[in-house]
Amino acid sequence: MGATRVVLAGGRGHGHWHLDNLRRLSARGLVRLAGVCDVTPLEPAALTRLGRPAQGPDLGALIDATGATAAIVCTPIHTHTALALTAAAHGADILLEKPPAPSLGEFRRLTRGLAGRGRACQIGFQSLGSHALRAVRELVADGAVGEVHGIGAAGNWVREEHYFRRAAWSGRRRLDGTDVVDGVLTNPLAHAVATALHLAGSTAEEDVEEVRTELYRAHEIESDDTSCVDIRTARGTRIVVAATLCAARAAEPYVVVHGSRGRITFWYKQDRVLLQRAGHGPDERAYGRTDLLENLLAHRADGTPLLVPPAATGAFMRVVEAVRTAEDPQPVPPSRWRTAAGERSHRRVVDGIDELVDAAAEKLATFAELGAPWAAPLRPAARR
């Protein structure tokens, strides 16, 4: 079988990561970059060791002209559904960046459209390709930490002010009347939410019973940059995910499984797992991961199951929908944040947020429940 012809939609921003991955897979003879779809052509330097792919702004026309049979969609959130369905209509299987859609309605339109075309689609939650997930699930199933009381997740990241000016849709909940929902939990730290749901065994829409949100912003943006969600699954598991882009120091995000006899911490970007339990010393191990584009190629070649088909992100989309339909994020009072120098622009640091985010994951409590002086009670619940 020859190299799969691939078209990349969106070659800038996170698209650079995909270009690097395509270089790696191209060197192995697995893919050939046939085209790049972007409003402005990429410079030759960005395409080093990728040949001279066709370039143009029309994804469907580019797929037809190049004979591509796979497409990577790495474009603004509010364009995901339309472009993925365009790729499917022109005969390509798709690797679609997260979040798959800005609303539950658009997500359902996406899944219906893909089913009607019979095309495969992988959602780009790279953490769900980690081999550590199976290890954690097996530890839980074997009773290593006793009865699971709940799952927490924490993300302390730093983003400077220029991050929210990188594109017209950055930091927006809506753009020209169209949902975008570019919030901390729905985009940059979406992996924390998706990974926690996966470890809870709750991946489908119907697996989520209730979602409550606390959305805040320190920056002058529409969307949230400091938030938490309290999720109740249909199984009764409580999941609390807290995240900020206004941390004093950037830290590796993690998910922690709390049990009656111990805990399991999973740093999902590092594929690293720490088991801590009574009567035993700490046991830390690192695992490999399967690249999601490689998994899509294997699915096309021999039917290998997709690791992250759209159906496996339905629960995550319930969280996106809860964030979308919540009241607009509340501003953190200026007295509760400070400005700090960044590498390219200034950034805002919420007082004590690093410790607060970690405490939310540790205690399975929201910012308001932890007594944050700027936090308000949880927003009305979004139920199924």
Indicate residue ranges for each PLM-predicted region.
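Conserved acidic residues
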Residues: 34, 53, 69
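Short, conserved SAM-binding/catalytic segment
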Residues: 45-52, 109-114
